[in-house]
Amino acid sequence: MSFSSDEVNFLVYRYLQESGFLHSAYVFGIESHISQSNINGALVPPAALLTILQKGLLYTEVEWSVGEDGEVARPIEGLSLIDAVMPEVKPLKPIVKTEPGKPGAVDSSAPAGGNQNNNAKPEIKIEPGTGVAGSAGGNKIAGSTTGTSTPTDQSASEVDSSGNAANNAGGTYAGNNGAGGNQASTGGSNSTSTPAGGDLAAPGASQKKSQNSNEAGSSSSGNAGNANATSTDDAASSTSTNGNSSTSSSVEQPTSGLTPAGGTVSTSNPDAAASGGASTATGSKAPSGAVTIRVGAQGNNVQSGSSNAQSSAPSGTISSSTSGGAGTPAALVPMDIDENIEIPESKARVLRGHESEVFICAWNPSRDLLASGSGDSTARIWDMSDANTNSNQLVLRHCIQKGGAEVPSNKDVTSLDWNCDGSLLATGSYDGYARIWKTDGRLASTLGQHKGPIFALKWNKCGNYILSAGVDKTTIIWDASTGQCTQQFAFHSAPALDVDWQTNQAFASCSTDQRIHVCRLGVNEPIKTFKGHTNEVNAIKWCPQGQLLASCSDDMTLKIWSMNRDRCCHDLQAHSKEIYTIKWSPTGPGTNNPNTNLILASASFDSTVRLWDVERGSCIHTLTKHTEPVYSVAFSPDGKHLASGSFDKCVHIWSTQTGQLVHSYKGTGGIFEVCWNSKGTKVGASASDGSVFVLDLRKF
C-alpha cells in the first residue's frame, strides 16, 4: 500500500469542492499545486475522500472489536472519526446506540479520563427525499452509521464522471454568459463554476455558473489548471459566498440579519441607498441548536436549520405582491407540477455529444442554430431547423499550441455569443483565449491577451467589437475583424465577472471587488463607478434603452443604477440567498414591444425567480416552483413568457402577465442555461450531465 501527498491533496481538494467550500478549494488548489499533479480527475468518483474515510472507520471498529486472542470481545459501533484517530481512546464499556425517541445512552467512546455526559448528543436526522431549496448538487445522499453523508445512487444525470456536482459561479462562477456566465464563481452566484478535478477558477468568477455560493457548483473535467492565473491574495479577494458557480452540497446555519424570502423592496433616495445597501450585507452565521439535516432527493444539498426555520407548509404556486415583494415564507414553498402543463418527451429533442457539463447555450439570431459550450473544451453548433431531423452538430475544438503542435486545451468553454447577423460565434474559455468561429465550424481568429480564464464575452450591436472579462481583473475590447486587442481596462481589483454593452463603444463591468465600472473606448479612466453592493457582483445588464443598469450580488440584493446618479435608484431586497443572474424584458420604448411595460427578472439560489416593476421598485410576481438554485432566466422575444432553468433539472415556462406556470419539462441534469430562439417558438437548455435539449412550444 502506498499513496502520495499529491493524491491526498487532490482528494481533499475535491472534498472541499463537493462540500461547497469553493473559496477554500481554490486557494488550497493553488498552494498544493494541484494543477501540476498527474491525477485524472475524471476517473475519481464523487465523495472519494468520504468513502475511504468511512471504510477506515469500519476497519477501526472491527479492529477494536476483536481481542488480542482473535475473539470478538465487544462490538464497537458508531465510532466517531475523531476517536478513531486517537489510539488511546478505546471504549471502556460497550457502546449502546442511541435511537430516536429513546433515552440517551452513555457514549463510551468519549476520551478516557474525560467528563462523561449522561445526556445523549442530539441526533442528526437524515431525511432522504426531502427537497431542499438551494441545493445545487445532483447526488442523492444517504446517512451512514458514522454520521457521514455519502453519495449513493449516483446516476450520470446527477453527477458526471468528473465528480462535478454541477457555479459559477457561481458560484457563482459559471460564466454569466454561460456557465461561466457568472460562472466560475462559487458558483458565487454566477457563480463561478469551479471544475472538480478540473481547472481552478477564482471563486466568484463567471464560471460561477458552475458555480454557486455556499451551495457550490458544478465542476468541469480535466486537469486542474490555471492555478497561476491569480495570486493567493487575488484568490482570496475574488472568492464569493455563493460559489456561482457552484452547486454541490451545502450545510447552512440560520443567518442573522437577513431579509426573509418574502422580504420587502426598498425604493431608496440617494442618501438612503447607501445605508440600505450596507444593511443588506450578509449577517454573521449564528450557531443553531438541535439540528436536522435534510437531503434533497434531487441534490446533495444539505441544509441545517434550527427550530425557527422557514415553514414548509404547502402554499400557492405564485406569491404576488404590490408592496415590494412582501410575503410570507410559507408562500415560497414549491408545490408539485400539474401534469397538464408538462411538456411531453415527444416535444423535446435531446442532443447528446458533449462529454462534460454544458455551461452555456445561445441561439443564432438569424437561423435555428443552437450553440453550446462545455467543460469538455468544445463548443458545438446544432442544426435545429425543421428540415434537419438528425440534429447535426459541428464540433468546435478549443486547442492550444504546445510543443509545436495543436492539442486540446482541456479547459471549460464558459461563455459564447453570436454577432448581430449570426454569421460569427465568439467563445470564451478557461484557457484564457477568446475565439471567433464561422457557422461552418472554421476558426476565424484567436484572441489572446487575458492572463487566465475568461468569464464573460459579448459582441456589440454593430458587430465590430467584442468585449471580454477575465480572472486577471481586466476587461478587453477586441477588434473583431483583426482579432487584435483595441483597449484593455484594468480598473477592477479582483476578477471581473460580467460585462454588458451600453452603446457600441461604452460598457459596464462588474467584479468580485463589489464595484461596477462604466467605461468607454478611448477613455483611460472609468466614466462612472457605482458602489453600494456589499458582496461580489455577479451580473449586470443594461435595460433595452441603455438608460438603467441592473446589478445582482451575493449580498442578496438587486440594484438599479442611472448614469445621472451616484447611488442606486432602487435597492430591491426580497431574495433570501445570493442572486445569480438577471434579465430585462424586451419590452417598453425603443423595443419591438413598445406598448408592454418593462420588467426585470432575477434568479436566485433561494430557488425562486422574481419579476420586478422597475419604475415602481416593486416585486410583481414571485415564481416558486423550483426546488433548487435557479441559474438562468430568459424572456421570449415578445416578453409574454419567461423561461427559467434550475438545478432541480427543470425548465419552467411562465406567463409574465399572470405569474402562472404554463409549461414545464424535466431533463436529466441540473440546468445551467436557458434561451429562446428569435421566433419565440423554441427554448434551448444546457445541463450538468452533458445534455442539451430543445423544447418545441409551437404545438402548445
Swiss-Prot record:
Keyword Cell cycle: yes
Function: F-box-like component of E3 ubiquitin ligase complexes; involved in R7 photoreceptor cell differentiation, cone cell development and neuronal cell cycle control. E3 ubiquitin ligase complexes mediate ubiquitination and subsequent proteasomal degradation of target proteins. Required for specification of R7 photoreceptor cell fate in the eye by participating in the ubiquitination and subsequent proteasomal degradation of Tramtrack (ttk), a general inhibitor of photoreceptor differentiation.
GO molecular function term, any single one: DNA-binding transcription factor binding
Domain notes: The F-box-like domain is related to the F-box domain, and apparently displays the same function as component of ubiquitin E3 ligase complexes.
UniProt record, GO biological process: cellular response to light stimulus; chaeta development; epidermal growth factor receptor signaling pathway; imaginal disc-derived wing margin morphogenesis; negative regulation of DNA-templated transcription; negative regulation of JNK cascade; negative regulation of neuron apoptotic process; neuron cellular homeostasis
Designated name of the protein: F-box-like/WD repeat-containing protein ebi
PROSITE patterns: LISH, WD_REPEATS_1, WD_REPEATS_2, WD_REPEATS_REGION
Additional record remark: 'Ebi' means 'shrimp' in Japanese.
Domain F-box-like intervals: 41-84
Annotated ranges, domain LisH: 4-36
Keywords per UniProt: Cell cycle, Nucleus, Repeat, Sensory transduction, Ubl conjugation pathway, Vision, WD repeat
Biased composition (Polar residues): 142-160, 251-270
Record gene name: ebi
WD repeat residues: 353-392, 408-447, 449-488, 491-531, 532-571, 574-622, 625-664, 666-700
Transmembrane segments: none
Compartments, record wording: Nucleus
Gene Ontology CC annotations of this record: histone deacetylase complex; nucleus; polytene chromosome; transcription repressor complex
Subunit structure comment from the entry: Component of some E3 complex at least composed of sina, ebi and phyl, required for the degradation of ttk. Probably forms a E3 complex with sno, required for the degradation of some component of the Su(H) repressor complex. Interacts with sno and Su(H) and Smr.
Biased composition (Low complexity): 161-198, 212-250, 272-287
PANTHER family listed in its UniProt record: F-BOX-LIKE_WD REPEAT-CONTAINING PROTEIN EBI, WD40 REPEAT PROTEIN
UniProt keyword Transcription regulation present: no
Tissue specificity comment: Widely expressed both in embryos and larvae.
InterPro entries referenced in this protein's UniProt entry, alphabetically: Ebi-like (IPR045183), G-protein_beta_WD-40_rep (IPR020472), LisH (IPR006594), Quinoprotein_ADH-like_sf (IPR011047), WD40/YVTN_repeat-like_dom_sf (IPR015943), WD40_repeat_CS (IPR019775), WD40_rpt (IPR001680)
Family: Belongs to the WD repeat EBI family.
Residues covered by region (Disordered): 93-287, 299-331
